[in-house]
Amino acid sequence: MVREEVPVSTRTLQWKCVESRADSKRLYYGRFVLSPLMKGQADTIGIAMRRALLGELEGTCITRAKSDKVPHEYSTVVGIEESVHEILMNLKKMVFRSDLYGTLDASICVRGPRHVTAQDIISPPSVEIVDTTQHIAVLTEPVDLCIELKIERGRGYCTRTQNNYQDGSYPIDAVSMPVRNANHSIHSYGNGNEKQEILFLEIWTNGSLTPKEALYEASRNLIDLFIPFLHAEEQDINRNMEDNLKRASVPFFAFDDGLDNIKREIILKRIFIDQLELPPRTYNCLKRSNIHTLLDLLSKSQEDLMRIEHFRVEDVKQIFDILQKGFTIDLLKNSNQFESR
């Protein structure tokens, strides 16, 4: 049997944004193109990217509201046009922009008559309200509306259990989905075995991320998922990798003197700081300084790290301790100076 040779494109794979617009504060649109791709590749990438965009990205939302003197969720309050349930549904729609993890406190405390909007939410400086005009309630009489809020960062849709009713606290189902919709389409060109494809990717976001930022985050999350397969060939380098994997932590490698620098750099680029299990505050400081991978981190001196806003000596020491436990690279030759400060 004679097999036909299947040609492989020698052109560099490129992507670009061909359209970008903001229809409103809570609706951004972006259209991207990736080409040239071999037959079948566009669908593979398109399906994976769409699922990652809709299910893997994190968002910030209100997860709990508390107000005194409210008998139950479906009750009404004199002087307030909406029922308690309607107010909770309006709070559920609030869109925030934040990189911080953990539970944050916010509040609303106003007096009517007036129109209550997202602008009336008193939130931490680290939390930005995307659309301050979002409607919450209408106070028709001179009554007070005071609500304590819990804001959290999460992923996907999470149904909250109904508890703590006695203290006037009500859970709000978390919708932590910054991407409202994502579609992909494919354009084929060429003939026979030379047929190639162009992937078109459309992304709509809620304003907490731009479509380009969403595309970057989704790509990074997909890379994180495939990293364990890429590391399979490195098992001989570090015999302790199996133990690391059993602990569900990032696979670490011992770089000996014979390891080629190019190979070392490629591996470091594949490991993102998300996998180092850093404390939330340290992680957020690094991200704000555009330190995304282990290669980015190792290229910084301790003086560079200390110049990061809100970074402390203890944070640098903790980073070095985490890396030293997983790598045989000697990162702490001068660790005594941390203790002497």
Curated annotation (Swiss-Prot):
Keywords: Chloroplast, DNA-directed RNA polymerase, Nucleotidyltransferase, Plastid, Transcription, Transferase
Region ranges (Alpha C-terminal domain (alpha-CTD)): 266-341
Alphabetized GO MF terms: DNA binding; DNA-directed RNA polymerase activity; protein dimerization activity
Annotated disulfide bonds: none
InterPro entries noted in UniProt: DNA-dir_RNA_pol_insert (IPR011262), DNA-dir_RNA_pol_RpoA/D/Rpb3 (IPR011263), DNA-dir_RpoA (IPR011773), RBP11-like (IPR036603), RNAP_asu_C (IPR011260), RNApol_insert_sf (IPR036643)
GO cellular component: chloroplast; DNA-directed RNA polymerase complex; mitochondrion
Region of interest (Alpha N-terminal domain (alpha-NTD)), residue spans: 1-233
This enzyme's EC code(s): 2.7.7.6
Localization per Swiss-Prot or TrEMBL: Plastid, Chloroplast
Entry's Gene Ontology BP terms: DNA-templated transcription
Main location: plastid
Domain of life: Eukaryota
Entry annotated with the keyword Transferase: yes
Reaction it catalyzes: RNA(n) + a ribonucleoside 5'-triphosphate = RNA(n+1) + diphosphate
NCBIfam families from the UniProt entry: rpoA (TIGR02027)
Domain notes: The N-terminal domain is essential for RNAP assembly and basal transcription, whereas the C-terminal domain is involved in interaction with transcriptional regulators and with upstream promoter elements.
Function: DNA-dependent RNA polymerase catalyzes the transcription of DNA into RNA using the four ribonucleoside triphosphates as substrates.
Family from the record: Belongs to the RNA polymerase alpha chain family.
Subunit structure: In plastids the minimal PEP RNA polymerase catalytic core is composed of four subunits: alpha, beta, beta', and beta''. When a (nuclear-encoded) sigma factor is associated with the core the holoenzyme is formed, which can initiate transcription.
HAMAP family noted in UniProt: RNApol_bact_RpoA
Name of this chain's protein: DNA-directed RNA polymerase subunit alpha
The encoding gene: rpoA
